[in-house]
Each structure stands twice: as C-alpha cells, then as structure tokens.
Amino acid sequence: MTPSPDSFTTWITGLRKWHGWLQLSAERPYMHSEEAYNSHYGVAAVETREGEGFCNLLQTHQIDTTGPALEIGCGTGYLTCGLARHYPGPDYLITDPSPTFLRLTQDQFGSNFAGIARRHYAVFNADDVTLLPTGMFSVIGLRSTLHHILKVEDFIAACARALRPGGARVMGSEPCETGFLLMAAVAQSIPSTLKAAGIEMRPEWTYKLNDFTSSVQFYCNRDIDKTYGEDKHYFEPYAMARLGETHGLKLEFLPTGSFQDFAPPYGNAFHCFSSFFLMYLQFCMRFDDDFMAQIRLHLKAQLKFIDDCYRSHAGPAVSSIFLFKKTPGATS
C-alpha cells in the first residue's frame, strides 16, 4: 500500500531535532577532513549536471517520482544541488552522518534557488536504514556511497522495503571489482617498467604504490572484518543483480556510466581506461607530480593496449551506475 501524501510530513515532523538538523542516527564524522574533501578530488565549483542527469535517468527508466526522494551520504553535495533543482516530487530528504558535510551541502543553496521539492536535512547513517518507513520513498539516491556501507546485503534489503513499487534505488560512481583489480595489476608493473627504463623507485613512491595495491586487495577480500575501514567494498554486477532480484529489484547496470552523462551536452565522463587510471592515482591516491610524470611516460604501451581493447565500446567497468527498480507487486 502506497503511503498517503501526508505520511512523509507526519513522519518527518516527528523526528528529533539536533543542533538544527533532523536526527535519525548518531553523528559520525568522516575519517578525513570534510572541509578539504573537494580540493582533494579536484572539485572547484558547485556541480549541477550530476543531479540533472540523475533525474533524466529516472525519466528514461520510467521511475515513479510522485513521492519523496532520499539521498543517503550527500557528502559535499556533488549530486545534491542538481537533484534538488530537477527532482519533480514533493520532498527531498538530504542525509549524511557528518553534520559538517550537511552544512557544506546546505551552504550551496541560496535564497533564490529554483527547485520544486521541499528540502530537508538529517543526520543519518546508512547502517540505520531499517529505521525508514515501509514504502515511503519513490527514489533512494546514492553517489559514491555504497562502498562505505558495511552490510551491503542488509542495506539493499532495507532499501527495497522503504521503496514504493515503481520506485528505484540509484547508485552512481560505485567501484567495480574487475576494473579496479585491473588497475592494481597494471600498477604492480610500475616498478619493473621504471627499472627497465633506468628509473629508480623512490621510497615515497613505493609507499604510495603499496598503499594503492593493498587497498584494492582489502576491498576485494570478503573474508576479513571491514568494520573500521572507511571504504570497504568493490562490486560485481552479476552478484548485485542476483541480490536485487531476491528483494524485488530489477537491476539496470550502466558500465563506466556517470550521472552527468545524461545531462546536456550528453557526453561521456569516462573517456578511457588510461584517463581514469591516471586520474585516480593523481587525485585519489595522491601520487606526486614526478611519479605521475614517469608513469605517463613509461606505461604508455600497457595503457594503450587496454584502451585499444575498448576502442568501440564502454569498458572496462571501473566506476559505474547501478539502477535498481522495484517491480510492481514486490513486497520486500
């Protein structure tokens, strides 16, 4: 049974208030500096195309948008601003376990911001998703968030329960296992490639390289405790499809897709493997400029080989979109 239009208002009005925020969970700061997050990833301006593309994707896949939308893990609002401007439903609940991230996101909205949906902000940890009312939301959106969640299967089951039939849980910028494993395999060839070129690995280069490859191994492993890791998982589309099907969710997998691909001018944010690989090492892993210059120069052949394998189709799947639509009649 679909909740009445007033049920969201009744529920959200009854939530506890804490330091100006609605509160569903205890606060939890991000493991690194929230204030420095955008500069760390090279984000210099407010992004609107991600949210616009997200909403266009909903329309393309005929997702019900008559009910509220929920964003889990807004971070600095990379998805939020455009989604708030273009979401056609009545309400938009913006959440993060970090009050600092909520403030950074809220600060993007001026008094003259154009958007239909009413915006609400709540301190909320994704691990508490079972607290959400059954059948409340038309859309649950996440960008670069699922891999932070410890119990993925429980999370997907709880999201399915909180969705209306015809609604969707849409996740973007989520890491795919095979693509990142390929990146780590290429990275492991860096020392021998540089040695063959007469370049000696510096101790700080070895440290950063080992940090990357050991992180990939940590995320791939499924037999260790990941409770205290900030990032925890990589994903495999076939396993995700089976998991979604168990809970009445049909998966549409968009390999290498980014939400902004579905907004004007409708380009592809993912250009090729080599571009993503080099960007990731530079901005995410913080390889220094000298190290990056040597990698660009001496790994050209390896990177070109992979790019040529995907010269006419998208791939390999590294960072992708997972859209789960709740099928009519599903009761999970």
Predicted ranges, named:
Residues 234, 238, 252-323:
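Conserved Class I S-adenosyl-L-methionine
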Residues 1-63, 66-75, 82, 170-211:
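Conserved class I S-adenosyl-L-methionine
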Residues 153-165:
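A short glycine-rich, Lys/Arg-flanked "PGG" loop and its adjoining helix->strand segment in the class I
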Residues 231-248:
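Short alpha-helix
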Residues 141:
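A conserved beta-strand element that flanks and buttresses the S-adenosyl-L-methionine
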Residues 78-128:
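Class I SAM-dependent methyltransferase SAM/SAH-binding core
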